[in-house]
Structures are given as C-alpha cells and as structure tokens.
Amino acid sequence: ITDGEYKSLAVISEDGPDQFWFVVERTIGGATKKYIELYTPEIFLDSMISYSGSATASVSGLAHLEGKTVQITADGAVHPDLVVSSGAITLNYTATDIKVGLKYVSKLTPTRYGSTSNAGTPLGKMKRWNKIFVRLDTSAIPIINGQRPPVRSPGTNFGNEEPVVSEDIEVRNLGYDLDGRIEIEQDLPLACHIVSIFGTLSVGD
C-alpha cells in the first residue's frame, strides 16, 4: 500500500475470482480519511480511478488524491507523473482510456546463490554476475539490480504505445558483492510477469 494504512479487509466470494475489499486510511489535505478500495490484480496503481470515453486530456473526480503525485497510463502508455490540484489533472495529450492512481513499486529478491561446485562452497566469497537474463511474458521491462535496459525499441515511433515484451532481458557486469543477490523492481504501472531468471556468475577466492 502507498501512503496509508489498511484498517480492515473483507473477501467476497462470487462466480470467478474472489474479491478483496479494503478500508484504507489516508491523509489528504491534512485530514485523515478512510476509503473503501477494491484490489484489482490487473491494475498496477493504488487508489485508482479510470476513464473510458471520447478523447480528453482532463481527468476529474480525484478529490481523494488531492495534492498527491499520481502515476498515469493513457491508452496503455505511461504518461509523466502529475500532481492533483482541485481534484483534477490535465494530461499532456488526449487519450480515450486513462488510469490514474498512486505509484507503488513491486520487488522480487530471489534466494541468494549457494550451490556448491568442485571448487567448494561459494559462501563467504566475492561474487559477480557477468550476465543476468530475466525472461518476461507480456510485461513491461523492469529494473534489474538498479539497471533498466532500454524501454523503447528503435522501431517504435514516438507517440505510439511501446508494446510489452515476451523475451529475455539482459543486463551485464553488475559488480562484486558477497551475496550475489538479484533484485528486480517494477516501478511502472504496467505488468511484470517473470518466467525465469538465469545468467553467468563468477565466484572469487
């Protein structure tokens, strides 16, 4: 959760997936307020509202986010962050499908490497990932150990949505440490479906 506290949770079972409803307490404009929010796993924003209709650059109905910096997707593309003022925002361009909400960062830290070899245990030795590959399925490119590979491909024209990818994303030469840890973060309001993580690791003495 971003910028607030969970106060209550209810799970409603219906046809299809269970629904998760929360009472969330947030401070808006210096006042403490409680909101009822529905968890939607396909939406990657907190306290989100959506608009679908004729092309517009103005989104209102954001009084519950007054003064907050919000993330936005416009027709599937990430729009620069904006600050809510008078319960509204104005985009840099028009769109027909807009989602607005609070940013959160999803993080994945796999178990550290500890497999033995003919050289013995790697524990207590300096390690370096020469290459890390993260296999994605229909996902936006995440940050891998502090690096985000290029998000846009040369063939995508500006003003067009960058399609999500289903491929192996590579980062190289990540420096030495004792743990050889991998950390993957997604700070964009887009999907991040990780199929596997693999690469080449050097272990020192």
Residue positions per predicted region:
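Beta-sheet repeat architectures centered on beta-propellers
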Residues: I1-D205
